[in-house]
């Protein structure tokens, strides 16, 4: 059973981060070292994303398919990062729509199972998991490609990392779907770059109570707050998302990408370099490995299994 950190109810290129040539990231904080060296081969793992080109081939549809809630696992994060790199390497592709095949769900957040520390106390898997999330965000937030999030329902916590990293967000209206970050309700703190994306979208006055209280908004309220750019019926979600992407593609790519860089490089730079990523990892590990958070996560997972 997959579980996610979610609601309890149900030719100028963008500067890209450089992957560490050694495949390692070591972080030191309070004398601790977290290794993010991967120890497993995920090459044979099932695909969690499907990619389909538009009729004219200049943009793609990326569809997340990881029922029941499209939880952002390390496998999902890695696959999305790799897929974006592959699309960027294709000179015919100018943008993509990121959507979901799971009814009523865009993404309900982080993979809770991967936030737990094993009985042996090894924090390596947790550190590797967060590193994969960092790199996924950088890939999506800094891509030269035009991006639109097509949101058919719940977009919560880690789901907002994906949606807010896109240039435009279109969300299904009138349904049960909710949009927001609720990490604080689990005793966690959203990463600074997620909080800043909320502020960039909604403004400080509106975003502050949403993030601090972990509030989740229906589509109409998310639209009013500026967190999403448009609402649409489910039957028109794909069409409206494609239309918004085509609006971006009407601008010459080099100009659009350069302006995107101007707007986003300051926030991207907070993780663009090794020091920033390791500092962010330290912050996450300090919180996620605390006894209170681990107890609360285990209690929540146990309650889900009883349902």
Region spans (language model):
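Glycine- (often His-adjacent) and acidic-residue-rich active-site loop
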Residues: 92, 100-138
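Acidic, divalent-metal-coordinating active-site segment for phosphoryl/phosphodiester hydrolysis
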Residues: 157, 214-221
């Amino acid at each position: 059973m997959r579980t996610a950190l979610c609601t309890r109810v149900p030719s100028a290129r963008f500067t890209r981060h450089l992957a560490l040539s050694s495949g390692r990231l070591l972080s030191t904080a309070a004398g601790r070292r977290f290794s993010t060296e991967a120890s497993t081969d995920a090459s044979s793992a099932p695909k969690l994303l499907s990619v389909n080109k538009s009729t004219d081939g200049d943009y793609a549809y990326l569809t997340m398919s990881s029922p029941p809630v499209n939880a952002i696992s390390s496998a999902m994060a890695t696959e999305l990062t790799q897929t974006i790199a592959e699309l960027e390497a294709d000179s015919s592709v100018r943008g993509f729509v990121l959507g979901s095949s799971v009814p009523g769900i865009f993404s309900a957040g982080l993979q809770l199972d991967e936030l737990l520390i094993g009985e042996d106390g090894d924090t390596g898997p947790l550190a590797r998991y967060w590193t994969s999330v960092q790199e996924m965000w950088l890939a999506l937030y800094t891509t030269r490609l035009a991006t639109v999030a097509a949101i058919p329902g719940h977009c919560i916590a880690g789901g907002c990392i994906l949606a807010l990293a896109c240039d435009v967000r279109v969300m299904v209206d009138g349904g049960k779907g909710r949009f927001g970050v609720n990490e604080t309700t689990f005793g966690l703190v959203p990463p600074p770059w997620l909080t800043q994306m909320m502020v960039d979208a909604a403004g400080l006055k509106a975003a502050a109570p949403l993030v601090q209280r972990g509030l989740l908004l229906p589509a109409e309220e998310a639209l009013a707050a500026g967190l999403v750019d448009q609402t649409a019926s489910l039957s028109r979600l794909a069409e409206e998302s494609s239309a918004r992407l085509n609006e971006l593609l009407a601008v010459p790519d080099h100009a659009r990408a350069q302006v995107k860089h101007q707007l986003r490089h300051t926030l991207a730079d907070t993780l663009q370099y090794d020091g920033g990523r390791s500092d962010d990892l330290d912050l996450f590990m300090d919180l996620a490995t605390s006894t209170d958070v681990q107890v609360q996560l285990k209690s929540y997972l146990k309650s889900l299994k009883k349902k």
